[in-house]
């Protein structure tokens, strides 16, 4: 059986990247929450 995690930098960035997060209201909320929490990495 094939493993479920098949890493791809492009797919990772397009799905979870900063620009993608900023496109939607919910994504901006995610970034804001991570900023408020003091995360070192806001997005991938």
Swiss-Prot record:
It comes from the Bacteria. One of its GO terms (biological process) is translation. InterPro entries: Ribosomal_bL34, Ribosomal_bL34_CS. One of its GO terms (cellular component) is ribosome. Pfam families: Ribosomal_L34. It comes from Polaromonas naphthalenivorans (strain CJ2). The lineage of its organism: Bacteria, Pseudomonadati, Pseudomonadota, Betaproteobacteria, Burkholderiales. The gene is rpmH. GO terms for molecular function: structural constituent of ribosome. The keyword Phosphoprotein does not apply. Belongs to the bacterial ribosomal protein bL34 family. Keywords: Ribonucleoprotein, Ribosomal protein. The keyword Ribonucleoprotein applies. NCBIfam families: rpmH_bact. This is Large ribosomal subunit protein bL34.
């Amino acid at each position: 059986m094939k493993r479920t995690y098949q890493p791809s930098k492009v797919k990772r960035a397009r799905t979870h990247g900063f620009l993608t997060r900023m496109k939607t209201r919910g994504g901006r909320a995610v970034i804001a929450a991570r900023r408020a929490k003091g995360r070192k990495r806001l997005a991938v």
